[in-house]
């Protein structure tokens, strides 16, 4: 039988893992190895993918991938907590604290003044960025779904001069499966940090320590930070930290990054091992007496053969040996072995496979997990099923239930739109508008009383206040939307959306993981494009990048709110939701076109860990809202401010720089008039509208400020409701802003960026034309 044949609630023992290449290696690295036991927790609402519990965590696999894994059914495993004798508490010796305790006595101290660089490495969603913020005093965003960090971030350790810690994207192993894993691996191998801070989720030692074992092979000082220890002890678990240090041969520090507990001790350990270059005391995890010693002999023989090549390539010996046995072509290419050496190594590996009864990759993974099992048996009392896990299961019965998941998702999104555009956001917007209007009146009176020059007064009132002021009034709506998105992200719900939507997205050629960048795209396209780095397939990554701009970003909200309140009063929530779902629908159609033309083939398999639901932290949510509000205000007083001044100047003066009484005679009218024939079939044949749409390429918010300046607040009298609907659809779909274009260029190159601009303008024109025609019929 295969894993696909399991029924919900049944358990099985893996016999063989099929497939090949990077995906199979990823399965092995995640603990899907021969001999591992797992239980089918549930199926997604559409029947695919499947959710398994293995090594104490939840892993999702598609039916097609589960079919490649042979298994035998076993008695259903109990998920209840089995109580064993609790480990005797011992005082942690404080290894290396204050740099006074020198454990090995043979350290190689760095010269005084050497900059101490640290790599912060760990699995996805293990609290790495939380620890980075505690170490450095930074305010990097934290989320409760795998893959929040997609690029390295550097900052000095707070209170420690001449130090730098780098927050790397989360990885499950040192195998290059996705682009962000390559970033992390290359940094550790090529940038040679002075020490590694390996953060481990203490509630799931089995999965996390697989990466730890690979890091110990890197010949770089390592300190292991056992994070979330408060959850372990709070659920009747315990860890013998001293015993774990002895077995791993490197310092182990219990911490709670979220509560800032143990972080100071961790810093002292890290500084000490970096300063004295105290490398791990153990790198050999293969037992010569285990399974006849086949794996042990193979690793040591390969290490001996490649020793000279490893030194020349500046790679760690033990790491290179195990990666060559696994078949890591990137490491093999760097060593430059000749054919005789390759043949000898291949012969050694084949002999090992025969003796061990497992293929090369599975044998290495099995060796590591066997050692991890010994560590857990000797040092870890697993916590009972946590209240977070129990709570997550109860919530998932509804939010990922067969008949309730999709209605819940639609209902949640509609509630977000209604509360944002009709209740909370709209109410706060009215209050801010009243304040801005009052300030505008007072400033106008002051300028009149001071007898200020008419040109300057026009600039201030018709330019700055009309433009920037109109955009600022939409700040409450944007902050409210980000508030709800933050709640969805921090709670862990977005990861569930990926699980629920995988089968649906596969029909258009994408993976369920693509939903995460797309949902981020509702906030801003720039981080959404960067978030695609978590996707393992280049095809999926490019396709998702090209579809992300169809998810309406928050910068377009001022446009929608402006026209909806003016032309569709009382229908704000309905129109807004319609626009968002229209963007998604157009994106689906475009994806189907891409799938049959530019990106033929199927999406990569869906392998994802589902985190427990957690209550969103007030500090994290508040921090995110502040960052988004600050970004909006900075844009309002920089890009939009300059754009409004430029628009004011161009619409106030003619070609001879004489101030005009009628903007029809202005420089702007002459330039924008060239585009009028293009927009006329859409019912947008007014040069002022053409101008506002062009300014929107700089920043979407400037569309509203430009309209306010050019129409002097009388836009409702200048265009019809039919034209307003056409304009809304065009604004929804046309070219993303310059910042988003730049991020697409950075990820895909300038040709793709240019193509996105042209293609989206064409799609927007066609969609707006259809809406305009339908409006004419109705």
Residue locations for each model-derived region?
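Conserved G1/Walker A P-loop phosphate-binding module
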Residues: 92-173
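Juxtamembrane inter-helical linkers in multi-pass membrane proteins
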Residues: 434, 438-442, 495-525, 600-624, ...
């Amino acid at each position: 039988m295969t894993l696909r044949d399991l029924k919900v609630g049944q358990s099985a023992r893996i016999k063989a893992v099929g497939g090949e290449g990077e995906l199979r290696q990823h399965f092995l690295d995640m603990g899907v190895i021969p001999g591992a036991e797992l239980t089918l927790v549930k199926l997604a609402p559409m029947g695919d993918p499947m959710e398994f519990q293995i090594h104490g965590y939840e892993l999702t696999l598609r039916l097609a991938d589960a079919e490649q894994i042979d298994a035998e059914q076993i008695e259903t495993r109990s998920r209840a907590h089995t109580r064993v004798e609790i480990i005797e508490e011992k005082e942690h010796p404080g290894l290396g604290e204050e740099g006074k305790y020198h454990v090995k006595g043979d350290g190689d101290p760095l010269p005084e003044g050497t900059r101490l660089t640290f790599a912060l490495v760990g699995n996805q969603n293990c609290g790495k960025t939380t620890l980075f913020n505690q170490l450095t005093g930074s305010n990097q965003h934290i989320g409760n779904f795998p893959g929040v960090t997609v690029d390295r971030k550097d900052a000095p350790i707070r209170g420690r001069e001449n130090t730098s810690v780098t927050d790397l994207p989360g990885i499950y192993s040192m195998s290059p499966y996705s682009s962000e894993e390559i970033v992390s691996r290359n940094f550790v191998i090529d940038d040679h940090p002075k020490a590694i801070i390996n953060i481990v989720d203490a509630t799931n030692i089995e999965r996390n320590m697989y990466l730890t074992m690979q890091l110990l092979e890197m010949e770089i000082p390592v300190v292991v930070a056992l994070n979330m220890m408060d959850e372990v002890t709070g659920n009747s678990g315990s860890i013998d930290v001293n015993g774990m240090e002895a077995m791993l041969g490197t310092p182990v520090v219990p911490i709670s990054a979220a509560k800032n507990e143990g972080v100071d001790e961790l810093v002292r350990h890290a500084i000490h091992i970096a300063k004295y270059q105290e490398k791990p005391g153990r790198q050999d995890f293969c037992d010569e007496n285990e399974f006849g010693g086949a794996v042990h002999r193979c690793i040591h023989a390969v290490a001996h053969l490649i020793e000279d090549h490893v030194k020349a390539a500046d790679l760690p010996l033990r790491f290179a040996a195990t990666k060559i046995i696994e078949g890591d072509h990137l490491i093999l290419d760097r060593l430059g072995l000749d054919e005789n050496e390759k043949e000898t190594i291949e012969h050694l590996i084949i002999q090992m496979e025969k003796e061990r009864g497992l293929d090369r990759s599975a044998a290495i993974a099995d060796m590591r997990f066997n050692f991890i099992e010994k560590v857990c048996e000797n040092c870890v009392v697993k916590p009972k099923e946590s209240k977070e896990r129990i709570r997550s299961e109860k919530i998932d019965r509804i939010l990922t239930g067969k008949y309730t998941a999709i209605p819940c998702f639609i209902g949640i999104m509609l509630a977000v739109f209604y509360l944002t555009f009709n209740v909370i956001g709209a109410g706060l917007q009215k209050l801010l508008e009243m304040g801005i209007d009052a300030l505008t009146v007072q400033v106008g009176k002051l300028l009149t009383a001071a007898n200020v020059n008419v040109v300057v007064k026009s600039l201030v009132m018709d330019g700055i206040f009309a433009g920037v002021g109109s955009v600022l009034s939409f700040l409450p709506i944007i902050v409210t939307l980000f508030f709800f998105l933050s709640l969805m992200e921090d709670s862990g719900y977005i990861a569930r959306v990926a699980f629920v939507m995988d089968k649906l997205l596969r029909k258009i050629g994408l993976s369920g993981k693509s939903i995460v960048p797309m949902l981020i795209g509702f906030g801003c396209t720039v981080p959404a494009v960067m978030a695609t780095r978590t996707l393992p397939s280049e095809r999926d990554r490019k396709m998702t990048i090209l579809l992300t701009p169809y998810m309406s970003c928050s910068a377009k909200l001022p446009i929608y709110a402006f026209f909806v309140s003016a032309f569709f009063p009382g229908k704000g929530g309905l129109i807004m939701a319609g626009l968002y779902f229209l963007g998604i629908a157009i994106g689906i159609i475009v994806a189907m076109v891409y799938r049959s033309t530019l990106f033929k083939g199927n999406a990569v398999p869906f392998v994802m860990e589902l985190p427990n639901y957690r209550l969103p932290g007030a500090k994290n949510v508040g921090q995110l809202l502040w960052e988004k509000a600050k970004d909006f205000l900075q844009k309002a007083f920089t890009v939009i401010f300059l754009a409004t001044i430029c628009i004011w100047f161009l619409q106030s003066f003619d070609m001879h720089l004489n101030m005009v009484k009628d903007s029809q005679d202005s420089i702007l009218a002459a330039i924008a008039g060239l585009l009028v024939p293009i927009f006329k079939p859409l019912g947008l044949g007014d040069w002022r509208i053409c101008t506002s749409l062009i300014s929107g390429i700089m920043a979407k918010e400037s569309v509203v400020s430009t309209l306010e300046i050019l129409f002097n607040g009388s836009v409702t009298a200048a265009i019809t409701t039919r034209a307003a609907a056409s304009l809304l659809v065009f604004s929804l779909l046309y070219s993303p802003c310059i910042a988003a274009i730049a991020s697409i260029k950075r990820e895909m190159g300038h040709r793709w960026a240019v193509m996105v601009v042209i293609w989206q303008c064409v799609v927007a024109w066609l969609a707006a034309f259809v809406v305009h025609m339908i409006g004419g019929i109705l």
